[in-house]
């Protein structure tokens, strides 16, 4: 996939644990999605096991939104698709809760 075809994240993403290293000695590919100062999702690369090389995504972390949208998590083939899943899940949560969409919150990496 070319860079211009990859999903363009709309929200702030940060490493879950800055400086933490994985089994291979490289920085962990583990990130949280932050919207309006709140962690709303997480993605992490699967280093071992049958899903090795994929990214696990989890949504539904908002403490302010009290509705559930399923599925709340799953696996994606790459980091861009996993980020898309988390951001779209958060959009659905806001919609189900009757809240307006979040726009214009993307900040530089």
Task: Label each PLM-derived region with a short phrase.
Residues 1-38, 66, 104-106:
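Negatively charged, low-complexity tracts enriched in Asp/Glu with abundant Ser/Thr
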Residues 60-81:
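A short, exposed loop/beta-hairpin motif centered on an aromatic-Gly-Thr core
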Residues 52-56, 68:
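A short, polar/proline- and glycine-enriched secondary-structure boundary/capping micro-motif
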Residues 95-109:
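Intrinsically disordered, low-complexity charged/polar segments
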């Amino acid at each position: 996939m070319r860079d211009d075809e990859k999903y363009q994240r709309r929200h702030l993403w940060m490493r879950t644990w800055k400086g933490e290293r994985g089994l291979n000695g490289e920085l962990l590919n583990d990130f949280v999605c932050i919207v309006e100062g709140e962690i709303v999702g997480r993605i992490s690369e699967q280093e071992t096991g049958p899903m090795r090389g994929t990214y696990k995504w989890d949504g539904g972390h908002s403490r302010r939104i009290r509705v559930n949208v399923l599925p709340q998590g799953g696996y994606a083939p790459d980091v861009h698709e996993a980020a898309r899943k988390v951001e779209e899940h958060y959009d659905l949560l806001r919609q189900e809760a009757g809240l307006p969409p979040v726009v214009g919150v993307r900040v530089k990496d």
